[in-house]
Amino acid sequence: MSTAPTVTPERSNQTVRKTYPNYKVIVLNDDFNTFQHVAECLVKYIPGMTGDLAWDLTNQVHYEGQAIVWVGPQEPAELYHQQLRRAGLTMAPLEAA
C-alpha cells in the first residue's frame, strides 16, 4: 500500500496591513453662530488650528455652506465632532474621507 505525498500549502511571511479609514469633521453654516464663536471653537477644539486658518474656515462655512475642519482617524474625529456640536456649532454627520 503506497501513500500519496502530503502537500502543505506555503504560508506567506508577509503581513498585509490595512489602514484605518479617515473621517472628515464638517462644520455647517447656520443663522445663529457668530464668526467669532465658530473661529474660537475651532482654535479651542481642533489640534494645531491657528487663528488665521480658523478664520479662513469660518469664512468658507459662511460662503460655501460648509467646511472640512479636520480629517483623521475615527476616534479623535468623533471627539472633535462632539466637542464642536456641544459648543453649539451645526455639524454634518461624520463622513469617511
UniProtKB/Swiss-Prot annotation:
Alphabetical list of SUPFAM superfamilies matching this protein: ClpS-like
Gene3D superfamilies per UniProt: 3.30.1390.10
GO biological process terms on file: protein catabolic process; proteolysis
Function: Involved in the modulation of the specificity of the ClpAP-mediated ATP-dependent protein degradation.
InterPro entries referenced in this protein's UniProt entry, alphabetically: ClpS, ClpS_core, Ribosomal_bL12_C/ClpS-like
The encoding gene: clpS
Family: Belongs to the ClpS family.
Originating species: Nostoc sp. (strain PCC 7120 / SAG 25.82 / UTEX 2576)
NCBIfam families named among the record's database cross-references: PRK13019.1-3
Residues that span the membrane, as ranges: none
Quaternary state and interactors: Binds to the N-terminal domain of the chaperone ClpA.
Listed name of the protein: ATP-dependent Clp protease adapter protein ClpS
PANTHER family according to UniProt: ATP-DEPENDENT CLP PROTEASE ADAPTER PROTEIN CLPS, ATP-DEPENDENT CLP PROTEASE ADAPTER PROTEIN CLPS1, CHLOROPLASTIC
Superkingdom, taxonomy of origin: Bacteria
